[in-house]
Amino acid sequence: MNIFDFLRSRKKETTASIAKERLQIIVAHERGQRSQPDYLPALQQELVEVIRKYVNIESDQVQVALENQGSCSILELNITLPDR
């Protein structure tokens, strides 16, 4: 009887620990998939609004990218300006 109790209790713990481990893997994968910070789209929109004060441009003419190189983060801003 003790062997059956041991197997039953072990199976329940194993199922819970497997589910927990799978969830941790999914969360870690989701975090790794985020290539840009949450504030980047808002930053891009604000930059478009500021640039529009001086130059007539569309939103798709401004691209913002954030690149991590070691301990440094590089913010790259590309603006397609209209011909004069």
From Swiss-Prot:
Pfam families assigned to the protein according to its UniProt record, in alphabetical order: MinE
InterPro entries: MinE, MinE_sf
Protein name stated in the entry: Cell division topological specificity factor
Disulfide bond annotation, renumbered to this chain: none
Family, as annotated: Belongs to the MinE family.
Role according to the record: Prevents the cell division inhibition by proteins MinC and MinD at internal division sites while permitting inhibition at polar sites. This ensures cell division at the proper site by restricting the formation of a division septum at the midpoint of the long axis of the cell.
Keywords: Cell cycle, Cell division
Gene Ontology biological-process annotations: cell division; regulation of division septum assembly
